[in-house]
């Protein structure tokens, strides 16, 4: 037993301290050299290091384990679309992030999964499945049903909402 994948952000020391592409590439190369499982690059504003679609696609082609990407930046759908176009088969898993706030746009751009805060995977999965099965109307209707909770978790409560849902569902014992 063990991890099937790791999610890694570029090294950072606060949102104003940035690393160059060579340093970020070297960091991900070192992680890849040390493990034998896929790496998901988390492209999040907290890292402070901009990661262009061209650079991410290059890392996917050049670094063995780098093949999944979680987009949490503004303009995520456009970035996913460009990453998929530039990276081709090297992009195994382009994913939506940020609590699914842009899920439908990201799915339309080519995202194949989503990593939300974790509180309502049972609500997100049917949206993704409906989209994958070519039923955008059902995906939209399901998304609208879950959107108030998505917005609440994303903009108001964060992990507190996820923990409350997990406690209510019997996944964890405390909040």
Q: Where do the language-model regions lie?
A:
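Active-site beta->alpha loop and helix N-cap motifs at the rims of alpha/beta catalytic domains
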Residues: 1-48
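Flexible glycine/acidic-rich beta-alpha junction loops that bind and position SAM and/or redox cofactors
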Residues: 16, 79, 164
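Catalytic alpha/beta core domains of metabolic enzymes, predominantly
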Residues: 45-157
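Active-site pocket-lining/capping segments in soluble small-molecule metabolic enzymes
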Residues: 153-168
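Flexible C-terminal active-site loop/helix
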Residues: 171-175
